[in-house]
Regions:
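Conserved functional acidic sites
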Residues: 1-204
Length: 204
């Protein structure tokens, strides 16, 4: 589990990430792939505003693949599923407006290098995201702790949103992000202890 604190336009936004116990199957070149589902729950000023579910799979070489995102938005009375997409056929539990993508995305390498470019979302005009590694080997300090060997990534889109800078820690994922007028930081994580242990091992 991971918990983030986001400050936006004078309001406090809390995001809670957990992996659900069940997996979801997808096909890659005719081969079934079991994906773990990351659920992100977002609260604004204590009110639930969005839940998204994101199936992920990791290849033997460490590459991370992204297969879909199902969005349930609760602001303004709820019922909005804008931005939902998946690879393959929809299931009864998927939002009816879910867009179909031709292939999986988010081919995030196991060891990103400076200048690497990858796309976690590639289905414009529904979703679009391009990530560029801007820096590596960073130590980043957030309320959840200090994380060594982080990478800095610039996230851009053709859909009009502002560029976003994100910092990722190995074995944890995103720990910090920043756009004009908005900042998010990891404040608690069940992965943090492992990161601290790894850091101690590196020092020894």
């Amino acid at each position: 589990m991971k918990v983030y604190n986001r400050q936006k336009e004078g309001k406090v936004d809390v995001v809670v990430d957990i992996f659900l116990p069940d997996t979801r199957m997808f096909q890659v070149d005719g081969t079934p792939v079991a994906c773990h589902v990351l659920q992100e729950t977002e609260f604004l000023d204590g009110q639930l505003i969005e839940i998204s579910r994101n199936p992920l799979a990791q290849a033997d070489d460490g590459t991370l693949y992204y297969f879909s995102e199902a969005v349930d938005t609760y602001q303004g009375g709820g019922g909005d599923h804008e931005g939902s997409w998946l690879v393959g056929d929809t299931e009864p539990t998927d939002p009816p407006s879910t867009a179909n993508a031709p292939a999986h995305t988010g081919d995030i390498p196991a060891s990103p290098a400076l200048g690497d470019v990858f796309k976690q979302e590639d289905l414009a005009p529904i979703v679009d995201e391009t990530d560029t590694v801007e820096d590596v080997g960073l130590t980043v300090h957030v309320p959840a702790g200090s994380f060594p060997n982080c990478i800095q990534v610039l996230e851009t889109t053709t859909l009009g949103d502002k560029p976003e800078t994100k910092w990722y820690a190995r074995g944890v994922g995103p720990i910090k992000s920043k756009t004009p007028g908005e900042k998010s930081e990891l404040i608690a994580s069940t992965f943090a202890a492992a990161a601290v242990t790894q850091r101690a091992a590196d020092i020894v």
